[in-house]
Amino acid sequence: MQVTETQAEGLKRAYTVVLPAAELDAKAQDRLVELKDKVRINGFRPGKVPLSHLKSLYGKSVMAEVIEQAVTEANGKIVEDNGLRLALPPKVELPQAEDEVKSVIEGQADLKYTVELEVLPKIELGNFKDIAIEKPVAIVTDEEVDEMVKRIADGNRSFDAKEGAAASGDRITVDFVGSIDGVPFEGGAGEDVPVVIGSNSFIPGFEEQLIGLSAGEERTINVTFPTNYLSAQLAGKDASFAVKAKQVEAPGELTIDDEFAKTLGLESLDKLKENVRERIAKEHEGATRQRVKRQLLDALDAGHKFDVPPTLVSQEFEGVWQQIQTDLQQQGRTFADESTTEEEARAEYQRIAERRVRLGLVLAEIGERNNIQVTDDEVTRAVVERARQFPGQEQQVWEYYRRNAQAMASLRAPLFEEKVVDFLLELAKVTEKQVSREELYKEEEEKAA
């Protein structure tokens, strides 16, 4: 085998490889000899088929198999001899000219091909003990618990039919048809829709204008869709709704006590509050984890600067970009609605794709050097947890993951990432800081705005 390096720039490598015809032909002959004892051909006793006859029948297919294996082995040797770690499978370019292919298959010419490799960078890991993390911790207050309990009670409040006009807090059932400039718009009509006045569940200004309506009465309501409304076709537009009241109901008495807790399957109000406190605490812990993890990943990104495999970045970008375009299309929005241009958005998501690839490589390197692994039991538990999200379809979900290696890998990857993050947090300088609920969620709320 003759190997000539033709490119060694950045993370790109390219080689021209020549596999001698004599070696390929010898391997093909060995294959035919093995085949001789296995095939059954009419007119010949087992094992007595002449090699020349076998070659006329199977020579081309056997040589094709030999070439495929020889190329794979040659590429593997190149990688091993040069101490390379591949980011992607080798890209092989075999001869295309018909006469050249014919000569190689018939064992009359050497096989000359090119192979392009994209390799992983050498990563110099930093000192993780120098990473400083501020861990925001929010204590669940009694006020938060009481507020949540009240919301639960409001959601379970009964309503009783009433005579007269609707007031704030009442539930009014309406039919409505919305229009813009006199033309009805898609999704703007509804029948028998219950609206709790003051719940802020509808477009700003809609609920307030229902006050004073009695069953059987009609009214035109004028509103303006928010500029950040989900549908770009409606955002910022003035609309009119022709509304007909069907029924008005007054809220029943709201009594939050042990009896109310029992209607929810709990033994007492104290038990309800305990459950609510645990739920809020779990939400706070999740928010804290995200804040801490983001700081850690930012530190890793800032502390590890190296070239990343361009094809990996391109693949990551294309996946993200396709999802962005799909989301915009489904929402009927454009980049202008997001206060940006397509060019600016592409540049931003290109940066995000590069960051994701870099962090993925850093985390993988840390995991490999520290023997961090995801066990089969951990993956199984993840599948079970996933299956629980689809009541009645647990078996189908299990079978899907069992038969789909890529889907199983999609569960293993985040488990691995979280284990590496846990490992790093044990090393980093983590300082707790008590914050309010508002401070804990402020960053996420600003991002959502």
UniProtKB/Swiss-Prot annotation:
Catalytic activity: [protein]-peptidylproline (omega=180) = [protein]-peptidylproline (omega=0)
Entry's localization field: Cytoplasm
Signal peptide, first to last residue: none
A GO BP annotation: cell division
Keyword annotations of the record: Cell cycle, Cell division, Chaperone, Cytoplasm, Isomerase, Rotamase
Pfam families per UniProt: FKBP_C, Trigger_C, Trigger_N
Entries under HAMAP family matching the protein: Trigger_factor_Tig
Function description: Involved in protein export. Acts as a chaperone by maintaining the newly synthesized protein in an open conformation. Functions as a peptidyl-prolyl cis-trans isomerase.
This protein's domain notes: Consists of 3 domains; the N-terminus binds the ribosome, the middle domain has PPIase activity, while the C-terminus has intrinsic chaperone activity on its own.
Alphabetical list of NCBIfam families matching this protein: tig (TIGR00115)
PANTHER family: TRIGGER FACTOR CHAPERONE AND PEPTIDYL-PROLYL CIS/TRANS ISOMERASE (PTHR30560), TRIGGER FACTOR-LIKE PROTEIN TIG, CHLOROPLASTIC (PTHR30560:SF3)
Protein name per UniProt: Trigger factor
